Amino acid sequence: MRERLLAAEKIKAIEWRDGTLHLLDQRLLPQEERWLSYDSASGVAGAIRDMVVRGAPAIGISAAYGVLLGARRRLAAGGDWRAALEEDFRVLAESRPTAVNLFWALDRMRERLARLKDGEDALVALEAEAVGIHESDREANLTMAQLGLELIRKHSGSPQALLTHCNTGALATGGFGTALGVIRAAWLEGLVDRVYADETRPWLQGARLTAWELAEEGIPVSLNADGAAAHLMKTKGITWVIVGADRITAEGDVANKIGTYQLAVVAMHHGVRFMVVAPSSTIDMSLHSGEDIPIEERDGRELLEIGGKRVAASVEAVNPVFDVTPADLIDAIVTERGVVERPNAAKMAELMSRKRLH
Protein backbone atom coordinates (compact mmCIF):
# COMPACT_ATOMS: atom_id res chain seq x y z
CA MET A 1 0.00 0.00 0.00
CA ARG A 2 2.86 2.39 0.77
CA GLU A 3 4.23 2.12 -2.76
CA ARG A 4 0.78 2.61 -4.29
CA LEU A 5 0.14 5.72 -2.19
CA LEU A 6 3.54 7.12 -3.12
CA ALA A 7 2.85 6.48 -6.79
CA ALA A 8 -0.51 8.26 -6.54
CA GLU A 9 0.88 11.37 -4.84
CA LYS A 10 -0.03 14.50 -6.82
CA ILE A 11 -0.58 17.36 -4.39
CA LYS A 12 1.58 19.08 -1.79
CA ALA A 13 1.18 22.35 0.07
CA ILE A 14 4.53 22.87 1.84
CA GLU A 15 8.05 23.00 0.43
CA TRP A 16 11.33 23.85 2.13
CA ARG A 17 13.70 24.86 -0.63
CA ASP A 18 16.82 27.04 -0.87
CA GLY A 19 16.48 28.20 2.71
CA THR A 20 12.95 29.49 2.17
CA LEU A 21 9.52 28.19 3.17
CA HIS A 22 7.12 27.94 0.23
CA LEU A 23 3.39 27.58 0.93
CA LEU A 24 0.57 26.96 -1.52
CA ASP A 25 -1.96 29.73 -0.87
CA GLN A 26 -5.04 27.71 0.01
CA ARG A 27 -7.29 30.76 0.11
CA LEU A 28 -7.19 30.89 -3.69
CA LEU A 29 -7.82 27.24 -4.51
CA PRO A 30 -9.16 25.80 -6.72
CA GLN A 31 -9.39 28.85 -8.99
CA GLU A 32 -5.70 29.69 -8.72
CA GLU A 33 -2.58 27.80 -7.66
CA ARG A 34 -0.20 30.39 -6.24
CA TRP A 35 2.86 29.70 -4.10
CA LEU A 36 4.02 32.26 -1.54
CA SER A 37 7.54 32.42 -0.06
CA TYR A 38 8.48 33.21 3.54
CA ASP A 39 11.81 34.08 5.14
CA SER A 40 10.75 35.25 8.62
CA ALA A 41 8.94 33.90 11.66
CA SER A 42 6.47 36.80 11.60
CA GLY A 43 5.66 36.07 7.96
CA VAL A 44 4.98 32.41 8.74
CA ALA A 45 2.81 33.39 11.72
CA GLY A 46 0.81 35.66 9.43
CA ALA A 47 0.38 32.85 6.90
CA ILE A 48 -0.98 30.58 9.65
CA ARG A 49 -3.27 33.27 11.07
CA ASP A 50 -4.59 34.31 7.64
CA MET A 51 -5.11 30.67 6.55
CA VAL A 52 -2.65 30.65 3.69
CA VAL A 53 -1.78 27.34 5.33
CA ARG A 54 -4.32 25.40 7.41
CA GLY A 55 -4.85 21.96 8.83
CA ALA A 56 -3.33 21.10 12.20
CA PRO A 57 -0.33 19.04 10.96
CA ALA A 58 0.52 21.58 8.25
CA ILE A 59 0.33 24.41 10.78
CA GLY A 60 2.79 22.59 13.05
CA ILE A 61 5.21 21.90 10.21
CA SER A 62 5.07 25.52 9.06
CA ALA A 63 5.66 26.78 12.59
CA ALA A 64 8.78 24.61 12.91
CA TYR A 65 10.22 26.19 9.78
CA GLY A 66 9.15 29.57 11.18
CA VAL A 67 11.37 29.03 14.22
CA LEU A 68 14.28 28.17 11.94
CA LEU A 69 13.74 31.33 9.89
CA GLY A 70 13.48 33.38 13.07
CA ALA A 71 16.72 31.92 14.42
CA ARG A 72 18.53 32.75 11.19
CA ARG A 73 17.47 36.39 11.41
CA ARG A 74 18.26 36.67 15.12
CA LEU A 75 21.72 35.18 14.65
CA ALA A 76 22.45 37.57 11.79
CA ALA A 77 21.42 40.51 13.98
CA GLY A 78 23.92 39.57 16.69
CA GLY A 79 23.52 40.03 20.42
CA ASP A 80 21.54 37.65 22.61
CA TRP A 81 19.83 35.84 19.75
CA ARG A 82 18.24 33.18 21.93
CA ALA A 83 16.46 35.76 24.06
CA ALA A 84 15.33 37.60 20.93
CA LEU A 85 14.03 34.34 19.45
CA GLU A 86 11.51 34.09 22.28
CA GLU A 87 9.50 36.81 20.55
CA ASP A 88 9.26 34.61 17.45
CA PHE A 89 8.08 31.67 19.57
CA ARG A 90 5.41 33.93 21.07
CA VAL A 91 4.17 35.29 17.73
CA LEU A 92 3.97 31.81 16.22
CA ALA A 93 2.18 30.39 19.27
CA GLU A 94 -0.49 33.08 19.08
CA SER A 95 -1.28 32.51 15.40
CA ARG A 96 -3.94 29.78 15.95
CA PRO A 97 -4.96 28.73 19.50
CA THR A 98 -6.81 25.42 18.97
CA ALA A 99 -4.45 23.27 16.87
CA VAL A 100 -2.18 21.56 19.40
CA ASN A 101 0.21 20.44 16.64
CA LEU A 102 1.38 24.06 16.56
CA PHE A 103 2.49 23.97 20.19
CA TRP A 104 3.89 20.46 19.84
CA ALA A 105 6.12 21.59 16.96
CA LEU A 106 7.23 24.70 18.82
CA ASP A 107 8.10 22.56 21.85
CA ARG A 108 10.13 20.23 19.62
CA MET A 109 12.10 23.17 18.25
CA ARG A 110 12.62 24.66 21.71
CA GLU A 111 13.85 21.33 23.06
CA ARG A 112 16.30 20.98 20.18
CA LEU A 113 17.56 24.47 20.91
CA ALA A 114 18.12 23.50 24.54
CA ARG A 115 20.19 20.47 23.50
CA LEU A 116 22.68 22.45 21.43
CA LYS A 117 26.25 21.55 22.32
CA ASP A 118 29.20 23.92 22.46
CA GLY A 119 30.38 24.57 18.94
CA GLU A 120 27.30 23.01 17.31
CA ASP A 121 25.81 24.94 14.40
CA ALA A 122 22.40 26.10 15.65
CA LEU A 123 20.92 26.62 12.19
CA VAL A 124 22.01 23.20 10.94
CA ALA A 125 20.49 21.58 14.04
CA LEU A 126 17.22 23.50 13.82
CA GLU A 127 16.87 22.82 10.10
CA ALA A 128 17.35 19.10 10.68
CA GLU A 129 14.67 19.19 13.39
CA ALA A 130 12.16 21.07 11.22
CA VAL A 131 12.76 18.79 8.24
CA GLY A 132 12.42 15.80 10.57
CA ILE A 133 9.03 17.06 11.79
CA HIS A 134 7.93 17.46 8.18
CA GLU A 135 9.12 14.01 7.09
CA SER A 136 7.76 12.24 10.16
CA ASP A 137 4.30 13.64 9.48
CA ARG A 138 4.43 12.24 5.96
CA GLU A 139 5.40 8.83 7.32
CA ALA A 140 2.65 9.02 9.93
CA ASN A 141 0.12 9.66 7.17
CA LEU A 142 1.19 6.52 5.34
CA THR A 143 0.86 4.44 8.50
CA MET A 144 -2.55 5.90 9.38
CA ALA A 145 -3.81 5.29 5.85
CA GLN A 146 -3.02 1.59 6.20
CA LEU A 147 -4.53 1.31 9.70
CA GLY A 148 -7.70 3.15 8.71
CA LEU A 149 -8.04 1.02 5.59
CA GLU A 150 -7.84 -2.15 7.69
CA LEU A 151 -10.54 -0.81 10.01
CA ILE A 152 -12.90 -0.15 7.09
CA ARG A 153 -12.18 -3.56 5.56
CA LYS A 154 -12.79 -5.30 8.90
CA HIS A 155 -16.42 -4.20 8.78
CA SER A 156 -17.04 -4.56 5.04
CA GLY A 157 -15.06 -5.68 2.02
CA SER A 158 -17.48 -4.13 -0.47
CA PRO A 159 -17.37 -0.67 -2.08
CA GLN A 160 -19.17 1.76 0.19
CA ALA A 161 -20.19 5.38 0.64
CA LEU A 162 -18.12 7.57 2.98
CA LEU A 163 -18.70 11.09 4.27
CA THR A 164 -16.00 13.55 5.28
CA HIS A 165 -15.84 17.10 6.62
CA CYS A 166 -13.47 20.03 6.09
CA ASN A 167 -10.14 19.18 4.41
CA THR A 168 -7.78 16.55 5.74
CA GLY A 169 -5.71 15.71 2.68
CA ALA A 170 -2.28 16.59 1.38
CA LEU A 171 -3.17 20.28 1.68
CA ALA A 172 -3.62 19.95 5.45
CA THR A 173 -0.56 17.82 6.22
CA GLY A 174 3.00 16.99 5.25
CA GLY A 175 1.69 14.56 2.63
CA PHE A 176 -1.27 12.32 1.67
CA GLY A 177 -3.53 13.35 4.51
CA THR A 178 -5.12 12.03 7.67
CA ALA A 179 -8.81 11.23 7.09
CA LEU A 180 -8.42 11.80 3.36
CA GLY A 181 -5.34 9.57 3.39
CA VAL A 182 -7.49 6.73 4.72
CA ILE A 183 -10.09 7.44 2.04
CA ARG A 184 -7.38 7.41 -0.65
CA ALA A 185 -6.10 4.04 0.58
CA ALA A 186 -9.63 2.63 0.69
CA TRP A 187 -10.22 3.80 -2.89
CA LEU A 188 -7.04 2.09 -4.09
CA GLU A 189 -8.29 -1.14 -2.47
CA GLY A 190 -11.71 -0.95 -4.13
CA LEU A 191 -13.59 -0.12 -0.93
CA VAL A 192 -15.02 3.24 -2.00
CA ASP A 193 -18.10 3.68 -4.14
CA ARG A 194 -18.48 7.42 -3.49
CA VAL A 195 -17.27 10.10 -1.10
CA TYR A 196 -19.68 12.77 0.14
CA ALA A 197 -17.83 15.97 1.03
CA ASP A 198 -19.46 18.54 3.30
CA GLU A 199 -18.94 22.03 1.89
CA THR A 200 -17.73 23.17 5.37
CA ARG A 201 -18.85 26.74 5.92
CA PRO A 202 -17.71 29.45 6.14
CA TRP A 203 -14.30 28.88 4.49
CA LEU A 204 -15.64 26.09 2.27
CA GLN A 205 -12.65 23.82 2.76
CA GLY A 206 -14.75 20.87 1.64
CA ALA A 207 -16.00 22.59 -1.50
CA ARG A 208 -12.75 24.30 -2.47
CA LEU A 209 -10.13 21.83 -1.25
CA THR A 210 -11.44 18.33 -0.51
CA ALA A 211 -13.61 18.07 -3.61
CA TRP A 212 -10.69 19.38 -5.68
CA GLU A 213 -8.18 16.91 -4.18
CA LEU A 214 -10.47 13.93 -4.71
CA ALA A 215 -11.39 14.98 -8.25
CA GLU A 216 -7.69 15.40 -9.09
CA GLU A 217 -7.18 11.73 -8.19
CA GLY A 218 -10.29 10.47 -9.97
CA ILE A 219 -12.09 9.45 -6.77
CA PRO A 220 -15.90 9.74 -7.14
CA VAL A 221 -16.99 12.68 -4.98
CA SER A 222 -20.27 14.51 -4.45
CA LEU A 223 -20.30 17.88 -2.74
CA ASN A 224 -23.14 18.51 -0.32
CA ALA A 225 -24.37 21.32 1.89
CA ASP A 226 -23.42 20.85 5.54
CA GLY A 227 -27.09 20.65 6.47
CA ALA A 228 -27.66 17.73 4.07
CA ALA A 229 -25.46 15.28 6.01
CA ALA A 230 -28.27 13.74 8.09
CA HIS A 231 -30.43 13.24 5.01
CA LEU A 232 -27.54 11.59 3.16
CA MET A 233 -26.84 9.22 6.04
CA LYS A 234 -30.49 8.21 5.97
CA THR A 235 -30.78 7.76 2.20
CA LYS A 236 -27.35 7.05 0.66
CA GLY A 237 -26.12 4.06 2.64
CA ILE A 238 -23.16 5.88 4.17
CA THR A 239 -21.15 3.48 6.33
CA TRP A 240 -18.44 5.74 7.77
CA VAL A 241 -17.96 9.39 8.66
CA ILE A 242 -14.19 9.98 8.55
CA VAL A 243 -12.73 13.24 9.90
CA GLY A 244 -9.48 14.70 11.17
CA ALA A 245 -8.75 16.50 14.43
CA ASP A 246 -7.07 19.64 15.71
CA ARG A 247 -6.78 18.49 19.32
CA ILE A 248 -7.61 15.27 21.17
CA THR A 249 -7.75 15.12 24.96
CA ALA A 250 -6.59 12.47 27.41
CA GLU A 251 -10.15 11.11 27.52
CA GLY A 252 -10.51 10.94 23.73
CA ASP A 253 -12.67 14.02 23.22
CA VAL A 254 -11.93 15.58 19.82
CA ALA A 255 -11.81 19.21 18.73
CA ASN A 256 -12.25 19.55 14.99
CA LYS A 257 -13.77 21.88 12.42
CA ILE A 258 -17.13 23.32 13.42
CA GLY A 259 -19.89 20.92 12.40
CA THR A 260 -18.02 17.76 13.39
CA TYR A 261 -19.94 17.37 16.66
CA GLN A 262 -23.33 17.41 14.95
CA LEU A 263 -22.07 14.87 12.40
CA ALA A 264 -21.14 12.51 15.24
CA VAL A 265 -24.55 12.89 16.88
CA VAL A 266 -26.36 12.22 13.60
CA ALA A 267 -24.04 9.32 12.75
CA MET A 268 -24.84 7.60 16.04
CA HIS A 269 -28.57 8.04 15.41
CA HIS A 270 -28.28 6.41 11.97
CA GLY A 271 -25.86 3.65 12.97
CA VAL A 272 -23.02 5.12 10.88
CA ARG A 273 -19.52 4.51 12.22
CA PHE A 274 -17.42 7.56 13.14
CA MET A 275 -13.64 7.55 12.62
CA VAL A 276 -11.14 10.25 13.65
CA VAL A 277 -7.72 10.15 11.97
CA ALA A 278 -4.88 12.24 13.40
CA PRO A 279 -1.18 11.91 14.26
CA SER A 280 -0.27 11.42 17.91
CA SER A 281 1.08 14.99 17.95
CA THR A 282 -2.59 16.04 17.95
CA ILE A 283 -3.18 14.31 21.29
CA ASP A 284 -2.83 16.65 24.27
CA MET A 285 -2.54 14.49 27.36
CA SER A 286 -2.35 17.61 29.54
CA LEU A 287 -6.04 18.27 28.93
CA HIS A 288 -8.50 16.04 30.76
CA SER A 289 -11.63 16.68 28.72
CA GLY A 290 -12.96 18.60 25.76
CA GLU A 291 -14.21 21.36 28.04
CA ASP A 292 -10.57 22.35 28.56
CA ILE A 293 -9.87 22.96 24.86
CA PRO A 294 -9.68 26.64 23.82
CA ILE A 295 -12.06 27.20 20.91
CA GLU A 296 -11.00 29.79 18.36
CA GLU A 297 -13.60 32.32 17.24
CA ARG A 298 -12.88 34.22 14.05
CA ASP A 299 -14.17 37.50 12.64
CA GLY A 300 -17.93 37.46 12.10
CA ARG A 301 -17.43 39.02 8.68
CA GLU A 302 -16.52 35.53 7.44
CA LEU A 303 -20.25 34.78 7.81
CA LEU A 304 -21.72 38.20 7.13
CA GLU A 305 -19.95 38.88 3.85
CA ILE A 306 -19.72 37.01 0.55
CA GLY A 307 -17.19 38.26 -1.99
CA GLY A 308 -16.60 41.30 0.20
CA LYS A 309 -20.28 42.31 0.12
CA ARG A 310 -22.48 42.38 3.20
CA VAL A 311 -25.37 39.90 2.94
CA ALA A 312 -26.90 40.26 6.41
CA ALA A 313 -27.51 43.86 7.39
CA SER A 314 -27.50 45.10 10.98
CA VAL A 315 -26.90 41.74 12.65
CA GLU A 316 -24.04 40.23 14.59
CA ALA A 317 -22.47 36.86 13.85
CA VAL A 318 -21.03 34.19 16.12
CA ASN A 319 -18.22 32.34 14.38
CA PRO A 320 -16.62 29.51 16.40
CA VAL A 321 -14.45 27.56 13.98
CA PHE A 322 -14.09 24.38 16.05
CA ASP A 323 -16.34 22.25 18.22
CA VAL A 324 -15.73 19.30 20.53
CA THR A 325 -17.02 15.78 19.88
CA PRO A 326 -17.26 13.69 23.08
CA ALA A 327 -15.38 10.40 23.09
CA ASP A 328 -18.56 8.38 23.57
CA LEU A 329 -19.69 9.36 20.05
CA ILE A 330 -16.48 8.12 18.42
CA ASP A 331 -16.01 4.57 17.14
CA ALA A 332 -12.27 4.81 16.51
CA ILE A 333 -9.30 7.15 16.72
CA VAL A 334 -6.59 6.21 14.23
CA THR A 335 -3.02 7.40 14.82
CA GLU A 336 0.40 6.30 13.61
CA ARG A 337 0.86 4.60 16.99
CA GLY A 338 -2.21 2.44 16.52
CA VAL A 339 -6.01 2.44 16.67
CA VAL A 340 -8.15 3.14 19.73
CA GLU A 341 -11.70 1.83 19.38
CA ARG A 342 -14.35 3.33 21.66
CA PRO A 343 -11.80 5.70 23.23
CA ASN A 344 -11.55 6.44 26.94
CA ALA A 345 -8.84 7.67 29.30
CA ALA A 346 -7.28 4.25 29.91
CA LYS A 347 -7.10 3.40 26.21
CA MET A 348 -5.65 6.81 25.32
CA ALA A 349 -2.96 6.46 28.00
CA GLU A 350 -2.03 3.01 26.70
CA LEU A 351 -1.82 4.35 23.14
CA MET A 352 0.50 7.18 24.12
CA SER A 353 2.78 4.79 26.01
CA ARG A 354 3.57 2.92 22.78
CA LYS A 355 6.54 3.65 20.59
CA ARG A 356 5.89 5.11 17.18
CA LEU A 357 5.25 2.58 14.45
CA HIS A 358 7.36 4.42 11.87
Curated annotation (Swiss-Prot):
It is an enzyme of class 5 (isomerase). InterPro entries: IF-2B-related, IF-M1Pi, IF_2B-like_C, Initiation_fac_2B_a/b/d, M1Pi_N, NagB/RpiA_transferase-like. It comes from the Bacteria. Keywords: Amino-acid biosynthesis, Isomerase, Methionine biosynthesis. GO terms for molecular function: S-methyl-5-thioribose-1-phosphate isomerase activity. Its EC number is 5.3.1.23. One of its GO terms (biological process) is L-methionine salvage from methylthioadenosine. SUPFAM superfamilies: NagB/RpiA/CoA transferase-like. It holds the Pfam family IF-2B. The active site is at D246. It catalyses: 5-(methylsulfanyl)-alpha-D-ribose 1-phosphate = 5-(methylsulfanyl)-D-ribulose 1-phosphate. The record marks C166 as: Transition state stabilizer. Substrate binds at R54, G55, A56, R96, Q205, N256, K257. Pathway: Amino-acid biosynthesis; L-methionine biosynthesis via salvage pathway; L-methionine from S-methyl-5-thio-alpha-D-ribose 1-phosphate: step 1/6. PANTHER family: METHYLTHIORIBOSE-1-PHOSPHATE ISOMERASE. Belongs to the eIF-2B alpha/beta/delta subunits family. MtnA subfamily. Catalyzes the interconversion of methylthioribose-1-phosphate (MTR-1-P) into methylthioribulose-1-phosphate (MTRu-1-P). This is Methylthioribose-1-phosphate isomerase. The gene is mtnA.
